[in-house]
Amino acid sequence: MIFDTKAAKFTLKNVFFLSLLIAAGAILIFSLVPGDCWFGSKTDWYSQHVTIADYMRKNFYATGQLFPDFTGLGGGTDFYSLSYYGFMRPDVLLSYCFPNLPVAFFIQGYAIFEILFGGGLLYYWLHKKGFSDFTSFVCGFFYLTANCFFQAHRQIIFVNYLPFLILAFLCLDKILNPEKASLYSIRPHIGLIFSLFFCILHSFYFFPSCFVACILYICHLLPQFKNGMVKSCQAGKIWW
C-alpha cells in the first residue's frame, strides 16, 4: 500500500524503521570501503577537496584569517576562485578545532553522515506526507543507494546539498499548512532560511536548481491548501 489513511504520527515503529534504514545504509557504506582506506578517491576527493581544505586550515593557523585574499595553490590564485568548493562547511570549520586530526577524517565522516541523514530525512518526510511505512522505507533505501552518491567520495559538492533540500521541503509543508499556522508561526520560516542557507554554503553552484525545486513544490502545494488558507488565514500570514 502506497498511502496510509491513518494519521501520520511518528511512533516507536517508525523509529525502528528509521534506525533500520540508517543501519542498512551504514553497513553498505562501510562494507564497500576496503580496509585501511578513506571513503574518498585519489583524484577529485583527495587532490582537490582534502588538499585545499588542509591548506586553508594551515593558512588559518598561520594568519588567523578565515577568508584569505590570496592562496599559494596552483602557483598562486585568488581565494574566491576556489570558494565554490564550499570550504565554510561545518566539517571543514570543525577540523580547525582539531589540528592533530587529518582533514580527510572530517570530510569523510561528514560525507557519510550526510548520506545517512538525507535517507532518514526522506523517510520522515514521506511518512509525514501520508505514505505507508513500507513505501517510505523503500524510497529512503533507494535514496541511500542512488547512483549519484558515488560523488560523495569524489566531487562532493555535487550531492552534499541534497539533505538540506529535503529539509526545505519539510519546512514548506508546515508553512503552507493552514491548520498548523498558529502552532508554527515563525519556526518553519527559520528552518527554510536555514535549509537554503546551507544549500548555498555547501554548493552555491547548485543553489539555483534548489531554489527552482522549492518554487515548483510551492506551486504544487498551493492548490491543495488554497481553500483552507482562504478560510483560516490571511494571505500575509502564510509567510509571516
Q: Which residues fall in each region the model found?
A:
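Membrane-interface coil-to-helix junctions
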Residues: 24-119, 143-163
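Transmembrane catalytic cores of multi-pass membrane glycosyltransferases
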Residues: 45, 52-63, 205-214, 218-219, ...
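Start-transfer (signal-anchor) and selected internal transmembrane alpha helices
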Residues: 1-33, 237-239
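Membrane-interfacial, low-structure loops and terminal tails that flank and connect transmembrane helices
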Residues: 1-9, 181-185, 225-238
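Transmembrane helix-loop junctions in multipass membrane proteins, especially transporters and channels
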Residues: 38-39, 100, 178-179, 222-230
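Membrane-embedded helix bundles of polyisoprenyl
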Residues: 21, 115-125, 129, 133-224, ...
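Juxtamembrane/interface motifs at transmembrane-helix termini
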Residues: 88, 172-173, 228-230
